[in-house]
Amino acid sequence: MGGWSSKPRKGMGTNLSVPNPLGFFPDHQLDPVFGANSNNPDWDFNPIKDHWPAANQVGVGAFGPGFTPPHGGVLGWSPQAQGMLTPVSTIPPPASANRQSGRQPTPISPPLRDSHPQAMQWNSTAFHQALQDPRVRGLYFPAGGSSSGTVNPAPNIASHISSISARTGDPVTNMENITSGFLGPLPVLQAGFFLLTRILTIPQSLDSWWTSLNFLGGSPVCLGQNSRSPTSNHSPTSCPPICPGYRWMCLRRFIIFLFILLLCLIFLLVLLDYQGMLPVCPLILGSTTTSTGPCKTCTTPAQGNSMFPSCCCTKPTDGNCTCIPIPSSWAFAKYLWEWASVRFSWLSLLVPFVQWFVGLSPTVWLSAIWMMWYWGPSLYSIVSSFIPLLPIFFCLWVYI
């Protein structure tokens, strides 16, 4: 780059007529900013200077006010590129002589006698009776109309929604019922999905508690990371498949899933037993056979109109039948208690003590409060994992 030179020019900058006062193009003859070459370093001694007299003229061109190229610029040879502004006429174009090309005004509605001639047939008795129906009348006469063939202008105020439905004939389906039918299950699905995501976190929470028992006072660390497997430092509850502790983690999760399933089955069994849907015959001491057949001494037969038998019959060897009614609630629990009392005789000795302890209600409540105060913080980490199951248990308890 530089000023004037006697060497032949190459590439960009060979057109000396293109103004370049700032030296943006390489090897241009006008380069006062970036320095001239060694042959003629002075701007004043350049014999081929382009004084560019048009640069002093004030105008709006391609390069802004006061900077108008005299013979075209980067934007071309247009008048706007050279700074010459063309005035724009402010006179609007003449109106179109074709008046039929635009939007036509709405034509006046024809009289009722022309548009609906059947409405003028007043000699028909059946048609006259049909017009007494507001829905049929609304089809032929708008609001405020008469049967004389002329239509009265509609009032300026909006009519009630009932008049609209009366003029349209059959009522439109209530959209509120449709939307409620579609949107009603959405909160249920959202709550179910939330509970499902919370339930899926139960195995991980219980797994963390299980592994924490092996690291009392410290953070749980997987013991398989020091083996030959290239595993980084991680928790035993999130072992990768290449870690030797991955199999033990899966085994713990499987046992936890079985425990949760057993807990749900126990709750369902307790619920069915409370509702009286488990017709378990009580354990009758000294009986040889027990069946649910019809009994002579039982007021309600065992196989009657009820879904479940309401009494159990014992048939000793002498042929006489004895009926014992099934408890309407907690039949299975009473059966288990009787069975345990027969197998473990010392349980019957606890009955008076339990009855006496329950009778002392202040003592029971104080003992429960003391146990919750002492063991509550340590048990909360375990019980809190089962909180998502409580809404499911509550729904089953209410609707079954």
From Swiss-Prot:
Annotated GO CC locations: membrane; viral envelope; virion membrane
Lipid-modified sites (N-myristoyl glycine): 2
Virion surface side: 2-181, 275-348, 399-400
Record-linked InterPro entries: HBV_HBSAG
Record topology, Intravirion segments: 2-253, 203-253, 370-375
Keyword Protein transport: no
Region (Pre-S2): 120-174
Chain positions carrying an annotated carbohydrate: 320
Domain comment (free text): The large envelope protein is synthesized with the pre-S region at the cytosolic side of the endoplasmic reticulum and, hence will be within the virion after budding. Therefore the pre-S region is not N-glycosylated. Later a post-translational translocation of N-terminal pre-S and TM1 domains occur in about 50% of proteins at the virion surface. These molecules change their topology by an unknown mechanism, resulting in exposure of pre-S region at virion surface.
Protein name: Large envelope protein
Record lineage: Viruses, Riboviria, Pararnavirae, Artverviricota, Revtraviricetes
Gene responsible for this protein: S
